[in-house]
């Protein structure tokens, strides 16, 4: 825990609204200001969300996020350890309010919000086409490639389509391609993630113990009524490496082992008391 001091955060805001599937070429970087946030991330196909407040942004930076759709990357961490991405998302709502001598900028983010709302798929595949190709093509077209997807697609290479025509929204198309194969999907930091059953995302495994930021004791939650699975709930100092789908190694008196993260809520304030990650993981 010795290195988990000196909290720090950084925002990167795109100078323009990128096209669906396009890349950002110019960023406005914000450092050294007070930032507070609540970020909610899950394995569900609904977009992950964040509420962010930034204090005393310059007039130029405020002007840069007046329009919906600008891309925002929120990073947080510790001075001795470095920064990790807490969320990357599209701005769906922004406001600037002057309170006394301070300007407070508030905005709401949705991870993959624009592509899920406006992205469309229209193509056809012949019988025998690997599912991995169809999913990879869609991800590439819509700018969702990257992350852990390259490691996850090979497991779909042996599965083939009977012949399919895709024409509709992104979520509808992914459901059509993946659900029959027993796979689920979500968007994490602007990248498509696909998982089979209770498999994990193959990312590095964060260690959660009293020496690495665990707060209090983990709790065992009542099994989900629909799936009959127990959940382990725990709270730690902010750790942005804890992402839905990854494994965490928990070490405590009551529970020890590796658990797959189902959801995480990161709360932080560089000048306040909040700086935690609240996690639910399956046993």
Language-model region placement:
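Assembly/oligomerization scaffold segments
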Residues: 1-108
């Amino acid at each position: 825990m010795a290195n988990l001091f000196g909290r720090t955060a950084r925002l990167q805001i795109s100078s323009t609204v990128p096209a669906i599937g396009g890349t950002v070429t110019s960023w406005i970087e914000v450092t050294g200001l007070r930032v507070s946030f609540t970020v909610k991330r899950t394995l569900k196909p609904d977009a992950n969300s964040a509420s962010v407040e930034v204090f005393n942004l310059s007039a130029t930076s405020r002007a840069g996020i007046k329009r919906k759709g600008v891309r925002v990357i929120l990073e947080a961490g510790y001075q001795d350890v470095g920064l990790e991405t807490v969320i990357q998302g599209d701005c769906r709502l922004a406001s600037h309010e002057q309170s006394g001598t301070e300007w407070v900028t508030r905005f709401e983010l949705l991870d993959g919000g624009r592509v899920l709302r406006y992205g469309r798929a229209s193509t056809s595949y012949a019988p025998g086409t690997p599912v991995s190709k169809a999913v990879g093509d869609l991800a590439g077209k819509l700018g969702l490639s990257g992350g852990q997807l390259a490691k996850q697609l090979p497991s779909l290479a042996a599965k083939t389509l009977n012949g399919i025509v895709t024409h509709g929204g992104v979520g509808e198309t992914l459901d059509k391609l993946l659900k029959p194969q027993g796979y689920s999907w979500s968007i994490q930091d602007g990248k498509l993630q696909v998982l089979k059953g209770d498999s994990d995302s193959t990312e590095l495994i964060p260690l959660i113990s009293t020496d690495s930021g665990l707060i209090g004791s983990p709790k065992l939650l009542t099994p989900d009524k629909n799936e009959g699975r127990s959940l382990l709930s725990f709270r730690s100092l902010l750790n942005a490496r804890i992402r839905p789908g990854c494994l965490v190694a928990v070490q405590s008196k009551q529970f020890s082992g590796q658990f797959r993260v189902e959801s995480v809520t990161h709360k932080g304030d560089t000048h306040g008391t909040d700086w935690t990650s609240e996690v639910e993981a399956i046993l």
